[in-house]
Amino acid sequence: MEHSQPAILIADDHPLFRDALAQMVSEGFPEYRIIEADSHASAVRALDSADPDLVLLDLNMPGMGGFAGLLSLRDHAPATPIAVISADETVSVVRQALTCGASGFIPKSMPKDHIVEAVRAILDGDTFVPFDLRESRPRAVADDPEFASGYATLTPQQRKVLELMIDGKSNKVIAYDLEVTERTVKAHVSAILRKLGVTSRTQAVLSAAKMLRSS
């Protein structure tokens, strides 16, 4: 069944937290339908039936197997951004989540308004990580070999999107220029940030522009 209204999938097996998060997201984003899942299997079914615009994912649901479940959901719906929402706030867990393809990491301890802003950032195509959980060593600057190798993995379409981002164009304008949906552009932006190892659109644009000027 097709739905015209965009949707956010909340996948968490703790009913009280899931209900509280659903209320937060519903109040912050009334234009989105809220879909719920309480296991890896039900999350897969929801991805297939609801085609959500974002997944807020608990790694410890039944059937997840931790990061293995994140990887399988990432493979199942590669165009859908997935944000891990977790009570485990260690930097190593954050790093592993991003390495496995998460578009963000949201601690369950964050205040309500901060969670809403984190969701907004990810829906806009950014990668969200709280400042205090970011690695202290700056990553993915333009002259960093990791940044260059990440840039080399971008698809031709992702490079076009990045070039238009450098030109200062919004997702809406990029979608018009490339004759694709805005949701497709957001998925490309999330993939670009993930591959370049950066956490914001601005960081991607500045670093890529510097690298391209020096090449």
Where is each model-derived feature located?
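Acidic, metal-coordinating helix/loop segments flanking the phosphotransfer/catalytic sites
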Residues: 36-54
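Active-site residues of response regulator receiver
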Residues: 58, 86
